[in-house]
Amino acid sequence: LIVEKGSIGNSFKHWPLSTKTITPSFTTNGFGMPDMNAIAKDTSPAFTFNEEHLSGKRYAEYLSLVATHYNLNVKTNTNVSRVTYIDGIYHVSTDYGVYTADYIFIATGDYSFPYHPFSYGLHYSEIQTFTQLKGDAFTIIGGNESSFDAAINLSQTGARISIYTSKTGLKKEDADPSIR
């Protein structure tokens, strides 16, 4: 069972319009190597859409196609209100009832709980297009993928960009920003 608070791929549908997958999709399945953006064996977003870097809307469409093809049990527009662990079983309370499971995987994503420490400024998830932002100088707080995506897109409008962060991966052994 997959419980989704919105539609399938909801957070991807809310990416800024200019945002694309960072890792390119390649149809390497025939060579025994999966497409890095694929979520199911023998599938490839690159093959499905003939694109190397998919938009969020396109990737959400891929997720929906995979869910349909594999007949996955997805409960959309369903909020989880509580999870309890009783006698070795998880009880997941939703607005449509309680589900039980031996294991649960929490995949809430950045868009579900955006970190907004200030009463001013915009979170990356609030931007639809970078061209809508007025000004010629922007300050970006943060140093991971969204920050650099914003910086690149804003610089293409001719704006001056400053990025401030307390953490970078430049001297880290592991480049995965999710563990910093």
Task: Give, region by region, the residue ranges found by the protein language model.
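Short glycine-/acidic-enriched loop or helix-start segments at secondary-structure transitions
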Residues: 11-13, 85, 115-117, 150-151, ...
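Glycine-rich dinucleotide-binding loop and its adjacent helix/turn
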Residues: 55-58, 103-157, 162-163
